């Protein structure tokens, strides 16, 4: 039986005009030789927000697009998605060269920023609502962009990353490279030294740095949990924030949400027993960015139970005669360093794996 033309068109239109992930060939200067993919929803908001979503090593833009569903909420809220795709070093983003770790230095970080500028210009996007997220290599790149282009990004969410500049000079960013000093958690600096790497990436910058969420699994055997603790100390020092409290079983059972300051600028999530890498909770990320919430990121999940505990003193006695300075680590499962804090500070438990002189 013949199908009436009107019914045929009604069936075809949603398929023909549905938004899809599309490659952009000419977005501007591309010193990192990255590929750019973009998702622009049909229901585009006036002055839409932008989310840059970055894949892990060995991944691609199309792979990461399919891994976590940011595009369905984009259809509802009208934001634009940018998916950079790395093409070198086992498809890892450049987080080790001076070019990528320097404001306007070039390489991958500048390529991604030029993708953002292209999108703002072409679609009238809101330059004050540019966000970034990623897993593993994408999480490391989130830290890189937060340090090198704090004037471009408003907030970020990094899943299983490491501190800014931890890979500096490593000669590569893939997990199989010979120099695994950073990924094994063997690079240790004071919080002030970690913060200096960030400040030196953009000399003269005096504005705010992006609000950040960092997530890490305690059983990560690719990027050490120590890197998570260093990541926390780096950014809380840059932002001038102190540990406030823990919220257990948030947003899932076994996860601990760590609040710094009032929780509006920096949050950390420790996932007990989770390996590499922590799965992305899209709803929590969108809330943190302010797309579905107020931008403070309450981090609650359906069915989760939350208890709040303030920092507690774990040790003030010396071990081996050494003393940890203000902000330094002083305890935690597997920790073998100084447990005595310089006066007047005390060693306060942040979680089972990390205590800090506060």
UniProtKB/Swiss-Prot annotation:
Reactions that this protein is recorded to catalyse: feruloyl-polysaccharide + H2O = ferulate + polysaccharide
Residue spans of biased composition, Low complexity class: 304-318
GO cellular component: extracellular region
A biological process from GO: xylan catabolic process
UniProt xrefs under Pfam families: CBM_1, Esterase_PHB
Signal peptide (from-to): 1-18
Ranges for region Disordered: 297-318
Subcellular location: Secreted
Glycosylation sites: 179, 246
UniProt EC number: 3.1.1.73
Catalytic residue list: 136 (charge relay system)
Annotated keywords: Carbohydrate metabolism, Glycoprotein, Hydrolase, Polysaccharide degradation, Secreted, Serine esterase, Signal, Xylan degradation
Region spans: Catalytic: 19-291
CBM1 domain mapped to chain residues: 322-358
Enzyme class, first EC level, given as a word: hydrolase
A GO MF label: cellulose binding
Region (Gly/Thr-rich linker): 292-321
Record InterPro entries: AB_hydrolase_fold, Cellulose-bd_dom_fun, Esterase_phb, Plant_Biomass_Hydrol_Est
Main location: secreted
UniProt record similarity statement: Belongs to the carbohydrate esterase 1 (CE1) family. Feruloyl esterase type B subfamily.
Role summary: Involved in degradation of plant cell walls. Hydrolyzes the feruloyl-arabinose ester bond in arabinoxylans as well as the feruloyl-galactose and feruloyl-arabinose ester bonds in pectin. Active against methyl esters of caffeate (MCA), but not sinapate (MSA).
Protein name: Feruloyl esterase B
């Amino acid at each position: 039986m013949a199908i009436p033309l009107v019914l045929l068109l009604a069936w075809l239109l949603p398929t023909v005009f549905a938004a899809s992930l599309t490659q952009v060939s000419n977005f501007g200067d591309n010193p990192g030789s990255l590929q750019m993919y973009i998702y622009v929803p049909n229901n585009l908001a006036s002055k839409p927000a932008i989310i840059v979503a970055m894949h892990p090593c060995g991944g691609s833009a199309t792979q990461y697009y399919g891994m976590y569903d940011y595009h369905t909420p984009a259809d509802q809220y009208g934001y634009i998605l940018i998916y950079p795709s790395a093409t070198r070093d086992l498809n890892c983003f450049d987080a080790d060269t001076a070019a990528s770790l320097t404001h306007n230095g070039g390489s991958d970080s500048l390529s991604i920023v030029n993708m953002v500028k292209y999108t703002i210009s072409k679609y009238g996007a809101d330059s004050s609502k540019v966000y970034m997220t990623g897993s593993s290599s994408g999480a490391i790149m989130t830290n890189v962009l937060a340090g090198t282009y704090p004037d471009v990004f408003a907030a970020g969410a990094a899943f299983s990353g490491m501190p800014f500049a931890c890979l500096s000079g490593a000669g590569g960013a893939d997990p199989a490279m010979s120099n695994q000093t950073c990924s094994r958690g063997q690079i240790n600096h004071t919080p002030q030294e970690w913060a200096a790497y960030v400040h030196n990436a953009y000399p003269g910058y005096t504005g705010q740095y992006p609000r950040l969420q960092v997530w890490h699994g305690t059983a990560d055997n690719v990027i050490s949990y120590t890197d998570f603790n260093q990541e926390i100390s780096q950014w809380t020092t840059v932002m001038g924030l102190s540990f406030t409290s823990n919220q257990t079983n948030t947003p899932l059972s076994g996860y601990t949400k760590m609040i710094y300051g009032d929780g509006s600028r920096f949050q950390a999530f420790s996932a007990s027993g989770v390996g590499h890498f922590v799965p992305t909770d899209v709803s929590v990320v969108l809330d943190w960015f302010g797309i579905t919430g107020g931008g403070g990121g309450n981090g609650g999940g359906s069915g989760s139970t939350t208890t709040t505990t303030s920092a507690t003193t774990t040790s003030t006695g010396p071990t081996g005669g050494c003393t940890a300075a203000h902000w330094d680590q002083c305890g935690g499962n597997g920790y073998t360093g100084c447990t005595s804090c310089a006066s007047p500070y005390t060693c306060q438990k942040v979680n089972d794996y990390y205590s800090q002189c506060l």
